[in-house]
Curated annotation (Swiss-Prot):
The keyword Nucleotidyltransferase appears for this protein: no
Gene source species: Phaeosphaeria nodorum (strain SN15 / ATCC MYA-4574 / FGSC 10173) (Glume blotch fungus)
Region Disordered, residue ranges: 28-217, 236-291, 390-423, 487-543, 579-852, 904-967, 979-1015
Compositionally skewed regions (Acidic residues) per UniProt: 204-217, 408-423, 504-536
Key words of the record: Coiled coil, Cytoplasm, Stress response
Coiled coil spans: 557-704
Protein's name according to its UniProt entry: Stress response protein NST1
GO cellular component: cytoplasm
Gene: NST1
Amino acid composition bias (Basic and acidic residues), ranges on this chain: 158-167, 579-710, 954-967
Length: 1202
């Protein structure tokens, strides 16, 4: 029964070439340019041939022929070669004598599969390769009924010649890709060299019309071609030798939209055929490849897939097949869910399920046999049944008839990488029409030299497979219908029980058949006798099973590949975890190594630190030992110094006690002497009072007598009055004699060796100069002139009314007008500045400044000094009566006397002047004229002249000098002079002219009142009341002998005595020994000063100075009145440890010689560095006011002594 329709004269089982061509589509060793004879190409499962000559009735260029085929091309019914998209025009197709369907177009790209084994389970599992001569024609290729008698005859002849030639020239065994020859292949059980009877075909008018070859090459749309664009070559490149072959353009007008692009080259996979002599790779190279699971080549991947399949157990293999079978059944049920529900379709579905189970069971048995065979032989099976030509891996995956152990290209993985299960393979499309299953034959069409049965099935989402299964299921029904048809020929073959719509392509096929009936009927009629070769039922079943295995193998490949990839993914995941673990382990090891190294470095540093600590501790211990030694030495030195200080203190205490005792003794003696002097003075005063009283009485008596006598003798002459006066004077002289001699005596003239000067009684303004007359002229003066000067009588005790003191000017001073006076008495200039007065200005000593920190006169003291006593009295107090003061003249130790008060060893201020000679003022008688006029001169002190009568009444008797010597001796010692000792009388030198040339070098350097000012001479070391003896800035000479201690204005040109003008060579006043200053203190201070001065010039490398040089400087600084400094005193002064401000400060070190003398001396300054000056506007308090007042030194403003 023919399942293609009423006009079909043959059934599915009568078309064995369809199954054979479908199986041939699994072979991948393709070559369109192979023109070898059949006997030379039998090593491959199919051979490539040149096109056959065109059949009769068509151009030679359009008829595809195979040069190696002896039989002419045979027309194939278009019902088996119908394309998917039908066209109403008639088409014609031809089949070569080798039963390969060819078309009129694309003749260079046709294949001629020969030498196909019988599709038994054993042959499919083992995939044998045998020479073409050893295989019967009916075992691989069955003769199809020809549309033309000539073609059938040629086919028969060629078939016979090919069989004979194959039997005579057997081809060598084919070489497998892995180097395994085909000698071990198994021939099918039904293989025979006998020719099978030719099948009988029905009338040719019942066949499907032929179709043009233009549609044969266009069974795949552009969308379908996209599915294969990615799997051509490794990394997207073509293999060498796989270039596009030029495709001749069609001579006919295209009838389909796909033919419009006929000029373009076909899809890439159409030309990707293996070269004829491709070398097979060595199996050892595959096994010795890298075992890396990350980067694997195609050969390695195939080897791994094969090993994976062989490593699977029986249960795992069954599970894979079972999953596949269940998936297919589920898909088929889904596809037929909305199909016809008639009894015929129901029986068909049941038959499909049963047939599917049987096919899968048989397929699993073949897989088991293949697995056992691979495990036993240890090599790959031939590629005849599995479609894998190992000598040239094809870039595009094709369907195979063997299970998935075969290798796969990388493109296969890319193609199916997104297909996780079988559902990804099937793509749902609209359900086909009733006759769409007939289009399954279009998958057998050659396209670009490649048969694509399995790909076409897969691309239609299993629809073709379901149709194929339906066809297989309908075989039983077809056999029943065929039996009924032979029994009742009038019955129509079409199953009217179906509800399916009639096939729309039948009319089109009629048109096509009518066009070619003219030349096809003749061929069928001529070869009717040769159509005795028919296919048995078993062969038809085998053909169907082969078609199923083609699809099932391709589906199962994906299952195995998916399982393999899952395994590889698991292995890679495991390997990744292992690598991560290894990486973590390496990282941990690296970190541990780093930690270990860090620990080593830390230990090394700790060790170094300990070494440094030990060294430091050792150094500290040594330093502590040195410090302890130094401390012990220092303590020893301090102890020695303490002992020395104690000894010095005891010594000083003893000296002080001795001095106090000496002072007390001297004070007692002085008090005793003073008491004696007071007693003597009181006695003398008493006697003088008595004598004065007696003299007054005598004088009064004499005056009274004279008045009486004058009254009685009023008219008497002068001659009579002279004896009376003489007598009265003589009587008075007798009374004045201190020795009690009452006898009168003749007065004598004053001692000529001691001339005296009469005192001036008038004022300076009225009588600038007192005239003096020579002694010789005194006798010629009349009493009248004397009376004019003294209008009233005077006694020796009466003070003249108009007498004025002349203490401001010493005797001998010219009576010319004096220069203008200086500042008022008691007021000094600015403190601290010895400005002095301009030339010609006279100064007065004052009590000092009234400013703070300066001494001022004590309360009760007059602001100005008291004027001196008149000239008639002595100008200085008695011994011990220095003046009305209630405090010592000297200041505190180390300081000078108070301002305005001279010290005990100083002369009175220049305002007082030196003491005048002991003389009395003349009474203005003629005796004053006895002295000739002469220049004033300073005469030494001499005895005062005795009281005599006036010269007018003095007898001119000069020969009584010897008689009155005793009286003169007593007269010279009258008064206060009698109280003075001979040693207490000062020897005052003659006064020099006080007028000095301005700018004279004899003046002292200008001083500023500071004790430490350069070249400042002062009486004490540090006088806080200003400099006492500083010169004036006006060039006036200083007064060192009779200047005031607080005379900062300098000295007047008319006061004081001159000092040494060469003051630069004179020693500093501070280096002189101060009053009441201990000698050791002064000596130490001078030694310190000398050492400081010589340290910059004569000091040795250690700072010591020769002791002899120091002693020479001491002798230069020593006052002539001071004793010479001895070595013992020098050493004793250096032993003073307590350096103070008074004794020079610091400390003195010395070196001893063997005999106890000093060899070297060194001064060590123990004071700190001078204080730093403050910022501008922020003075340091220590600089705001000197410590010692305005007379003290400035701290820290220069070297010592400034």
């Amino acid at each position: 029964m023919d399942w293609t329709g009423a006009r079909a004269r043959t059934s599915w089982g009568k078309r064995p070439q369809t199954a054979a061509l479908g199986l041939a589509a699994t072979f991948r060793h393709l070559n369109t340019d192979d023109h070898r004879p059949i006997e030379q190409t039998t090593q491959t499962p199919y051979s490539l041939h040149r096109p056959l000559p065109p059949p009769s009735g068509e151009p030679a260029t359009d008829t595809p022929t195979h040069s190696s085929c002896p039989a002419p091309p045979i027309a194939v019914p278009s019902s088996l070669l119908l394309p998917r998209t039908t066209h109403p025009s008639s088409r014609s197709s031809h089949i070569c004598a080798c039963h390969t369907p060819v078309t009129a177009r694309h003749s260079p790209n046709r294949l001629c599969p020969v030498s196909l084994p019988t599709p038994t389970p054993r042959s499919m599992a083992q995939g044998t390769k045998a020479p073409a001569a050893a295989m019967p024609p009916n075992s691989s290729v069955l003769n199809m009924p020809a549309l033309n008698a000539v073609n059938r005859k040629k086919q028969k002849r060629r078939e016979k010649e090919a069989a004979k030639k194959a039997a005579q020239d057997p081809s060598p065994p084919a070489t497998l890709r892995n180097g395994v020859s085909s000698g071990s292949t198994h021939l099918p059980a039904n293989a025979a060299h006998t020719r099978q009877p030719a099948p009988h075909y029905d009338d040719p008018e019942l066949d499907d019309p032929q179709y043009d070859d233009e549609d044969d090459a266009d069974f795949y749309s552009d969308e379908e071609a996209e599915h294969y664009e990615h799997a051509y070559g490794t990394n997207g490149h073509y293999q060498q030798g796989y270039a596009h072959a030029p495709i001749p353009s069609s001579s006919k007008k295209p009838r389909k939209k796909k033919k419009g692009a006929a000029a373009h080259p076909p899809h890439a996979y159409t030309q990707h055929v293996a070269p004829r002599h491709s070398p097979a790779p060595n199996h050892s190279m595959v096994t010795s490849g890298s075992k890396s699971i990350w980067n694997t080549s195609t050969v390695e991947e195939r080897e791994r897939i094969r090993e994976f399949w062989l490593s699977l157990g029986e249960d795992e293999r069954k599970s894979l097949v079972k999953i596949e079978k269940e998936a297919v059944l589920r898909k088929m049920k889904e596809q037929q869910k909305h199909s016809c529900s008639c009894s015929v379709c129901g029986r068909k579905r049941t038959a499909i399920e049963e047939e599917l189970e049987v096919l899968y069971d048989a397929y699993y048995e073949e897989l088991e046999q293949y697995a056992h065979l691979q495990q036993d032989v240890g090599r790959f099976l031939p590629d005849a049944n599995f479609g894998h030509v190992r000598s040239a891996p094809h870039p595009r995956p094709l369907m195979t008839t063997h299970p998935p152990p075969g290798p796969y290209d990388d493109e296969e993985e890319d193609e199916y990488s997104g297909e996780d299960d079988e559902e990804d393979i099937f793509k749902y499309l609209p359900p086909p029409d009733a006759a769409d299953f007939l289009r399954f034959g279009s998958s057998l069409t050659v396209k670009g030299g490649i048969l694509t049965v399995a790909d076409d099935l897969l691309k239609n989402d299993g629809k073709k497979f379901i149709e194929m299964m339906e066809q297989l299921a309908e075989r039983r029904m077809q056999r029943e219908e065929e039996a009924n048809f032979h029994a009742h020929p009038s019955m129509h073959r079409y199953n009217s029980a179906h509800n399916h719509a009639p096939q729309p392509e039948e009319e089109e096929y009629d048109d096509e058949v009518d066009e070619e009936e003219g030349f096809e009927d003749e061929d069928y009629e001529e070869d009717d006798e040769d159509e005795d070769e028919a296919m048995t039922e078993e062969q038809r079943m085998e053909e169907g099973r082969r078609m199923f295995q083609i699809f099932a193998a391709r589906m199962f490949e994906q299952r195995v590949l998916q399982a393999y990839r899952e395994k590889v993914a698991a292995e890679r995941q495991k390997r990744l975890l292992e690598e991560l673990e290894e990486e973590n382990e390496k990282k941990d090891q690296k970190e541990a190594k780093k930690a270990k190294e860090a620990q080593k470095r830390k230990e090394k540093k700790e060790k170094q630190r300990q070494i440094k600590a030990e060294e430091k501790a050792k150094k500290d211990a040594e330093l502590a030992a040195k410090e302890a030694e130094l401390k012990a030495a220092e303590e020893k030195r301090l102890e020695e110094q303490r002992k020395k200080r104690e000894e010095q203190r005891k010594k000083k205490e003893a000296e002080r006690k001795a001095q106090e005792e000496e002072k007390q003794r001297k004070e007692a003696e002085r008090q005793k002497r003073l008491q004696e002097e007071r007693d003597r003075q009181q006695e003398l005063e008493r006697k003088a009072r008595e004598q004065k009283a007696l003299e007054k009485k005598v004088k009064d008596d004499a005056k009274r007598k004279e008045r009486d006598r004058a009254g009685s003798q009023g008219e008497g002459g002068s001659g009579r009055r002279r004896p009376t006066t003489t007598a009265s004077a003589r009587s008075v002289k007798v009374c004045r004699s201190p020795h009690g001699i009452l006898s009168s005596f003749v007065p004598k003239a004053p001692t000529p060796s001691r001339p005296r000067q009469t005192s001036r009684q008038g004022s300076h303004g009225s009588s600038p100069k007192t005239p003096q007359v020579a002694p010789g002229t005194s006798k010629s003066m009349s009493p009248t002139s004397q009376a004019q000067g003294n209008m009233m009588p005077k006694s020796i005790l009466t003070k003249p009314a108009n007498s004025q003191h002349a203490g401001h000017h010493p005797l001998g001073q010219p009576s010319s007008p004096m220069p203008p006076i200086g500042p008022p008495p008691g007021l000094s200039g600015p403190p601290g500045l010895s400005m002095g007065l301009p030339p010609g200005l006279n100064g007065f000593p004052g009590p000092g400044s009234m400013l703070p920190n300066m001494m001022s006169p004590r309360p009760g003291m007059p602001f100005f000094p008291q004027p001196p006593v008149p000239q008639a009295f002595r100008g200085f107090p008695p011994p011990g009566m220095a003046g009305p003061r209630g405090f010592p003249m000297d200041g505190p130790p180390g300081l000078g006397p108070m301002p305005g008060f001279a010290g005990p060893n100083q002369a009175p201020p220049f305002g007082m002047g030196p003491p005048t000679q002991h003389s009395r003022q003349g009474s203005g008688s003629f005796a004053s004229m006895d002295v000739p006029i002469s220049a004033p001169s300073v005469q030494p002190i001499h005895r005062p002249a005795p009281i005599q009568r006036p010269s007018s009444v003095k007898p001119h008797d000069s020969n009584k000098h010897g008689q009155d010597s005793d009286v003169d001796e007593l007269a010279d010692h009258l008064g206060s002079k009698a109280l003075l000792d001979e040693e207490d009388v000062p020897e005052i030198p003659d006064r020099r002219s006080s007028v000095q040339q301005h700018g004279s070098m004899r003046s002292m350097p200008i001083g500023f009142g500071f004790p430490d000012a350069p070249n400042s001479h002062q009486s004490t070391a540090f006088n806080g009341f200003g400099s006492a003896n500083t010169a004036s800035i006006w060039g006036t000479p200083p007064s060192q002998a009779f200047s005031s201690a607080a005379g900062p204005w300098g000295n007047s040109p008319t006061s004081g005595f001159f000092t040494n003008p060469l003051t630069m060579s004179s020693p500093r006043v501070s280096d002189h020994r101060a009053p009441n200053e201990p000698r050791l203190v002064w000596l130490r201070r001078v030694i310190c000063t000398v050492c400081k001065m010589l340290s910059s010039r004569h000091a040795g490398p250690d700072g010591f100075i020769d002791a002899n040089e120091v002693q020479q400087q001491l002798d230069a600084f020593r006052d002539p009145r001071e004793p010479v400094v001895t070595q013992e005193e020098l050493k004793e002064a250096c032993d003073i440890i307590d350096g103070t401000h008074n004794n020079g400060g610091g400390s003195l070190e010395y070196k001893n010689l063997g005999d106890g003398r000093l060899s070297h001396i060194k001064f060590v300054d123990t004071t700190g560095p001078p204080p730093a000056l403050g910022e501008i506007g922020s003075p340091i308090p220590s600089h705001s006011l000197p410590v010692a007042g305005f007379g003290g030194r400035f701290p820290g403003l220069g070297p010592q002594g400034f």
